[in-house]
């Protein structure tokens, strides 16, 4: 993956954790997540689709204002290997999000990309790299993505803390009420174990 500027974890010899959130739509849990990050002075990356920028512009601006990375999760959440047949279609999935972000914030979107559903091919990775992106996968994810079927607070916290390791990239979903409720405690417990939270490298 290195040849395509793609990675799924950070430095495995450093007690560092990278928080990342995928944002497909807003259901009221992102602001409590931002509140917890602010209270505990922890940075994160938010991978947003085009629809999210359209429908939650003030939250996106808050992410930027509070020092987080807002990065690209495509415009329509397509499986990117399925659109490699057309360079124009493929590129537009990323550049449309860049344009929306620039129009909203006046800033260039950071060149980090998370492929929808984690799906990729050698060709899609190469095409993403050609646009100047690093592709960011993850070393941990769990079943937090169904709002109507959320893990309990105990299950969510235990699942995350039991799987921490040096260089962890955590994939969490911002639609998860469990994540919003436990995030502050997770940050505190991780720090007690010697971890610190950094922005993506």
PLM regions: where:
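Structural recognition of the beta-strand scaffold that forms the well-ordered cores
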Residues: 17-20, 44-48, 69-72, 111-115, ...
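Active-site beta-loop-alpha junctions enriched in small/polar residues
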Residues: 24, 49-51, 75, 116-118, ...
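Catalytic grooves of carbohydrate-active enzymes
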Residues: 164-201
């Amino acid at each position: 993956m290195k040849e395509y500027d793609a990675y799924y974890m950070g430095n495995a010899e450093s007690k560092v954790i990278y928080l990342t959130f995928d944002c497909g739509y807003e259901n009221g849990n992102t602001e409590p997540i931002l509140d917890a990050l602010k209270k505990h002075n922890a940075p994160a990356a938010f991978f947003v689709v085009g629809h999210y920028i359209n429908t939650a512009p003030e939250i996106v601006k808050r992410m930027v204002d509070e020092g987080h990375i807002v990065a690209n999760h495509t415009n329509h959440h397509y499986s990117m290997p399925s659109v490699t047949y057309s360079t124009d279609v493929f590129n537009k999935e990323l550049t449309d999000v860049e344009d929306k972000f620039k129009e909203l914030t006046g800033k260039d979107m950071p060149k980090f990309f998370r492929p929808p559903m984690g799906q990729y091919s050698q060709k899609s990775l190469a095409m993403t790299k050609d646009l100047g992106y690093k592709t960011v996968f993850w070393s941990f994810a769990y079943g937090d993505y169904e709002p109507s079927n959320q893990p309990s607070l105990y299950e969510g916290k235990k699942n995350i803390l039991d799987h921490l390791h040096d260089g962890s990239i955590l994939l969490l979903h911002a639609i998860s009420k469990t994540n919003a409720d436990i995030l502050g405690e997770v940050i505190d417990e991780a720090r007690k174990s010697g971890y610190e939270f950094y922005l993506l490298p």
